[in-house]
Amino acid sequence: MEREQDTPWTQSTEHINIQKRGNGQQTQKLEHPNLTQLMDHYLRIMSQVDMHKQTVSWKQWLSLKSPTQESLKTRVLKRWKLFNKQEWTS
């Protein structure tokens, strides 16, 4: 039986179970995770991405040199519009 080509998707969605045979050899059994495991994995990755976005955003705020209230307001509005546009398209 031929094994399907390993891709990043199949590698990340398959779990490898190693079982010992009676003679000491190890066999690998590829097992597809259930939907709950996939959703859990997806949510974990997305929350990490979201945390990274927030960190980058705060670093940009902290890098501003003595901003005026007007420049902050302009910056916030630009970021808000950009963020909303990305939310609607994704």
From Swiss-Prot:
Comp. bias (Polar residues): 7-28
Matching InterPro entries: Flu_proapoptotic_PB1-F2
Biological process, per Gene Ontology: symbiont-mediated perturbation of host apoptosis; symbiont-mediated suppression of host cytoplasmic pattern recognition receptor signaling pathway via inhibition of MAVS activity
Any one GO CC term of the record: host cell cytosol
Residue segments, region Mitochondrial targeting sequence: 65-87
Pfam family, one: PB1-F2
Keywords from the named record: Apoptosis, Host cytoplasm, Host membrane, Host mitochondrion, Host mitochondrion inner membrane, Host nucleus, Host-virus interaction, Inhibition of host innate immune response by virus, Inhibition of host MAVS by virus, Inhibition of host RLR pathway by virus, Membrane, Modulation of host cell apoptosis by virus, Viral immunoevasion
Disordered: region residues: 1-29
Site residues, High pathogenicity: S66
Compartments it resides in: Host mitochondrion inner membrane; Host nucleus; Host cytoplasm, Host cytosol
Keyword Ubl conjugation in annotation: no
Keyword Membrane part of the UniProt annotation: yes
Additional facts recorded: Is not encoded in all strains, and seems to be dispensable for replication.
Function text: Plays an important role in promoting lung pathology in both primary viral infection and secondary bacterial infection. Promotes alteration of mitochondrial morphology, dissipation of mitochondrial membrane potential, and cell death. Alternatively, inhibits the production of interferon in the infected cell at the level of host mitochondrial antiviral signaling MAVS. Its level of expression differs greatly depending on which cell type is infected, in a manner that is independent of the levels of expression of other viral proteins. Monocytic cells are more affected than epithelial cells.
Subunit structure, interactors included: Oligomer. Interacts with human SLC25A6/ANT3 and VDAC1. Interacts with host MAVS.
Family (UniProt): Belongs to the influenza viruses PB1-F2 family.
Protein name, UniProt field: Protein PB1-F2
Organism: Influenza A virus (strain A/Turkey/Minnesota/833/1980 H4N2)
This protein's encoding gene: PB1
